[in-house]
């Protein structure tokens, strides 16, 4: 039997496990020493050096600010003077991404979905205020750490907007907000709108496009045909505004009446809600483990 040796990255990092096989960048769990594990994103060798440096700059820019929302940047191949490889090392989230929890029909109740989407909304507002757009908010880029705190990854797809035209900046922000709408629906239904199991992706795109023209009827018909979740008029309005490109400021999202229950909480009360969310994720893990046995 052939046993492959763990991959080495630069002088510091050894492969523990490769966790994605179908996309670039490749993502590994690595360790620097037995007690320290990290995510390592390995980019193709032919990745344009300027593009790679740009990705690194986004992480370094964010790292200058104390924030609880994103996977912390640790290092990169340029900083370690490694020429033959291009990689970025990030904080390791032990519980993996939300896609492992919200899938196969699993979904969150409305209260829990509000907490997750509130935290993600605060995170998006945080980077928008730093003139950074994320560009790829999705369930696959939202992780849980050891204590079930939400940590967001995927920033290497981001865009720094310091010297970008104001109209263009708005476009980037609208894209993040629209992605938040898709995320919210997936949290509540357990289904990805553009997955083949949900329906025809082109019909969904057309229905979202119709929302921008003021017609949301077809969109909600598709949603209700493929989900048992009962969307309130208040929530429908919020999601429609996200897709209709009527909101470009995250504060409008956070101040929406659908979030009033969360926004009224003080920090101590909010921590209690987070404990409930932690319990919910633990239950999902137990159900998954029982299903495997």
Mark where each language-model region is.
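AlphaC helix of the protein kinase catalytic domain
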Residues: 98-108
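Terminal C-lobe "cap" of eukaryotic-type protein kinase domains
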Residues: 243-267
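Catalytic-loop of the protein kinase fold
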Residues: 128-145
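Short beta-strand micro-motifs within the conserved protein kinase catalytic domain, predominantly
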Residues: 72-86
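Conserved short submotifs of the Hanks-type protein kinase catalytic core
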Residues: 83-97
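ATP-binding glycine-rich loop module of kinase domains
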Residues: 23-54
């Amino acid at each position: 039997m052939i046993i492959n040796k763990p991959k080495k990255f630069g002088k510091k990092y050894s492969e523990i496990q490769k966790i994605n096989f179908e996309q670039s960048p490749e993502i590994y769990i690595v360790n620097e020493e037995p007690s320290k594990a990290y995510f390592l994103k390995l980019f193709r060798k032919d990745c344009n050096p300027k593009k790679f440096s740009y990705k690194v700059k986004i992480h370094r820019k964010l790292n200058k600010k104390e924030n609880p929302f994103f996977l912390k940047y640790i290092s990169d191949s340029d900083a370690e003077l490694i020429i033959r490889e291009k990689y970025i090392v990030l904080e390791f989230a032990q519980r993996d991404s939300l896609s492992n929890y919200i899938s196969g029909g699993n979904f969150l109740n409305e209260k829990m979905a509000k907490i997750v989407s509130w935290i993600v909304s605060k995170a998006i507002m945080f980077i928008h205020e730093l003139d950074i757009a994320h560009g790829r908010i999705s369930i696959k880029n939202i992780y849980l750490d050891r204590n079930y705190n939400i940590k967001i990854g995927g920033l290497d797809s981001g865009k720094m907007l310091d010297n970008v035209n104001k109209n263009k900046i708005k476009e980037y922000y609208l894209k993040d907000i629209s992605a938040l709408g898709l995320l919210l629906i997936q949290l509540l239904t357990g289904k990805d709108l553009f997955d083949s199991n949900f329906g025809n992706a082109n019909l969904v795109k057309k229905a979202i496009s119709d929302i921008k023209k003021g017609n949301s009827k077809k969109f909600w018909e598709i949603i209700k045909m493929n989900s048992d979740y009962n969307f309130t008029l208040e929530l429908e309005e919020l999601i429609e505004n996200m897709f209709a490109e009527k909101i470009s400021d995250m504060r409008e999202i956070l101040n929406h009446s659908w979030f009033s229950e969360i926004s009224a909480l003080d920090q101590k009360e909010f921590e209690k809600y987070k404990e409930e969310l932690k319990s919910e994720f633990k239950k999902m893990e137990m159900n998954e483990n029982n299903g495997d046995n």
